[in-house]
UniProtKB/Swiss-Prot annotation:
Homodimer. Heterotetramer of two MnmE and two MnmG subunits. Belongs to the TRAFAC class TrmE-Era-EngA-EngB-Septin-like GTPase superfamily. TrmE GTPase family. This is tRNA modification GTPase MnmE. It holds the Pfam family MMR_HSR1. The lineage of its organism: Bacteria, Pseudomonadati, Pseudomonadota, Gammaproteobacteria, Enterobacterales. It is found in: Cytoplasm. (6S)-5-formyl-5,6,7,8-tetrahydrofolate binds at R23, E80, K120, K454. Its EC number is 3.6.-.-. Residues 216-377 form the TrmE-type G domain. It comes from Salmonella arizonae (strain ATCC BAA-731 / CDC346-86 / RSK2980). GO terms for biological process: tRNA methylation; tRNA wobble uridine modification. One of its GO terms (cellular component) is cytosol.
Length: 454
């Protein structure tokens, strides 16, 4: 589909509501205004007008807002019609607009896409719009707004600027060896490179926090039947989300709860008790349990403390530990401390965390909550943060790898050409976050800021 088309879409959620909004963007937005409203409203003023059908009959009446480009969200001419929120009324108005030549229904996200293509937003800001809408906590909403206002992009652009400056010196030393420029060996390049690496590490740490706010942590509660898995789910959720009985195998399918711990989203999954089951339904539930375990960020290995004194997961159930994916973090949860009399709290056993609690009474559950938060490195005191997506983390990781490779080339062999290439690749990875990378970016900067002939 062409970006020269004029697009229209409903900007408010489907269904009944007090107000329904249609948004139009493109070259023919002016024609839509003149056809449906009979006039072109004064720019950026609210105008109360009837919305007319082709035969002149009034379909609805409401507020019309006219934003001529480029001073609009998309950078194009934009018309916004705010009428009553009945689905029939909005559908009639939408059908009327679509009869105007050159107007079509917008694709999902196309208004934001046009804003990006017209340099009204960079890619990270455009993504932040969706993140702000989908935010599931106050902290996530604030961080998404920070990203929309350019906080993340500013950090990335600062790194790109520093890399551009560094590349100027490196490439000058390579291309003009007779000009007595010896930046490769006098320590300046190394010092600047170390500074960029340190700044990148700081951005990566913030991005990991932002990713946690957006993606959350997937925690699977697993163990034998009657270990108290469903009771723990209820304790973490603060409500009776799962049925709890003394009958082994009560939970036969996956149960999911979405909760927050001091702003960090947590996807808690209760699974069927793991055992050799003859019942077909229970067997399917156990298969699903293993599927969830394999995709988890952390497994809470639930142990009935009344059945064993062991604390090492390898001693408690070696077959279970052997089947777990390699490097999957495990927290052993010894349950029923109210019966065994064990001291509540957390400790370390052979590289695994061990939490003693009572899911039935709730004692020790706060210790587990804090452990989950700390195990993911979540900082509840983070101010002015931003949201980040998995692709952002990947791009930052790639940039960090290129910088470390470049540093190795600099210190190991004084290989300026290889260093320059790693710096270029690092800059490209960073610029992919904002969508601003072009291969010609560096050329103009070199000739405008560095006097070679001096």
């Amino acid at each position: 589909m062409s970006h020269n088309d004029t697009i229209v879409a409903q900007a408010t959620p489907p269904g009944r509501g007090g107000v329904g909004i249609l948004r139009i963007s493109g070259l023919n937005a002016k024609k839509v205004a003149q056809t449906v409203l009979g006039k072109l409203p004064k720019p950026r003023y609210a105008d109360y007008l009837p919305f007319k059908d082709a035969d002149g009959a009034t379909l609805d009446q409401g507020i019309a807002l006219w934003f001529p480009g480029p001073n609009s969200f998309t950078g194009e001419d934009v018309l916004e019609l705010q009428g009553h929120g009945g689905p029939v009324i909005l559908d009639l108005l939408l059908k009327r607009i679509l009869t105007i030549p050159g107007v079509r229904i917008a694709r999902p996200g196309e208004f934001s896409e046009r804003a990006f293509l017209n340099d009204k937003l960079d890619l990270a800001q455009a993504e932040a719009i969706a993140d702000l809408i989908d935010a599931s906590s106050e902290q996530a909403a604030r961080s998404a707004l920070n990203s929309l206002q350019g906080a993340f992009s500013a950090r990335v652009n600062h790194l790109v600027e520093a890399l551009t400056h560094l590349r100027i010196y490196v490439e000058a030393a390579i291309d003009f060896p007779d000009e007595e420029i010896d930046f490769l060996s006098d320590g300046k390049i190394e010092a600047q490179l170390n500074g960029v690496i340190a700044d990148l590490d700081a951005v990566r740490a913030e991005a990991r926090q932002g990713s946690l706010l957006r993606e959350g942590m997937k925690v699977v509660i697993a163990g034998r039947p009657n270990a108290g898995k469903s009771s723990l789910l209820n304790a973490l959720a603060g409500r009776e989300a799962a049925i709890v009985t003394d009958i082994a195998g009560t939970t036969r399918d996956v149960l999911r709860e979405h909760i927050h711990i001091d702003g960090m989203p947590l996807h808690v999954i209760d699974t069927a008790g793991l055992r050799d089951a003859s019942d077909e339904v229970e067997r399917i539930g156990i298969e699903r349990a293993w599927q969830e375990i394999e995709q988890a960020d952390r497994v809470l290995f639930m142990v009935d403390g009344t059945t064993t004194d062991a604390v090492d997961p390898g001693d408690i159930w070696p077959d279970f530990i052997a089947r777990l994916p390699k490097n999957l973090p495990i927290t052993v949860v010894r349950n029923k401390a109210d019966i065994t009399g064990e001291m509540l709290g957390i400790s370390e056993v052979n590289g695994h965390s061990l939490v003693r609690l009572s899911a039935r009474t709730g004692e020790g559950v706060d210790v587990l909550r804090n452990h989950l938060k700390q195990s993911m490195g979540f900082d509840t005191n983070m101010e002015g943060g931003f949201l980040a997506r998995r692709r952002h983390l990947q791009a930052l990781a790639e940039a960090a790898e290129h910088l470390e490779q470049g540093k190795a080339q600099l210190l190991g062999a004084w290989a300026g050409e290889l260093l320059a290439e790693e710096l270029r690749l690092a800059q490209q990875s960073l610029s992919e976050i904002t969508g601003e990378f072009t291969s010609d970016d560096l050329l103009g900067r070199i000739f405008s800021s560095f006097c070679i002939g001096k």
